[in-house]
Amino acid sequence: MIQQESRLKVADNTGAKEILCIRVLGGSSRRYAGIGDIIVATVKDAIPGGNVKRGDVVKAVVVRTVKERRRPDGSYIKFDENAAVIIKPDNDPRGTRIFGPVGRELREKRFMKIISLAPEVL
């Protein structure tokens, strides 16, 4: 469950290490984002020489959340951290690698490129 001012780890190789959520996309009064939702964020921490630098405003898709999410079969999925992948305007990832597992909900939301790059889909 990601909301404004939430800080997320970046799970790709764009050069950003941490982002801060500015806005949850999908309606004027939408408060929370879960796995597979798109947010607008600013880069808070980045490595030198990366594709993005500190202060850049980017779009990202949430791939892991600490808050558990109920699946249609009755099971729950939750992760140890909140993480996101920075995306381009056409919803493809900006980086070329994805680190760590991602939620299966990304497949339903049609983020196939992220699914194919991820080492594990839970």
UniProtKB/Swiss-Prot annotation:
CDD domains: Ribosomal_uL14. The keyword RNA-binding applies. GO terms for biological process: translation. It comes from the Bacteria. GO terms for cellular component: cytosolic large ribosomal subunit. The keyword Secreted does not apply. Keywords: Ribonucleoprotein, Ribosomal protein, RNA-binding, rRNA-binding. Transmembrane segments: none annotated. GO terms for molecular function: large ribosomal subunit rRNA binding; structural constituent of ribosome. Part of the 50S ribosomal subunit. Forms a cluster with proteins L3 and L19. In the 70S ribosome, L14 and L19 interact and together make contacts with the 16S rRNA in bridges B5 and B8. Belongs to the universal ribosomal protein uL14 family. HAMAP family: Ribosomal_uL14 (MF_01367). Binds to 23S rRNA. Forms part of two intersubunit bridges in the 70S ribosome. This is Large ribosomal subunit protein uL14. It comes from Mycobacterium marinum (strain ATCC BAA-535 / M). The gene is rplN.
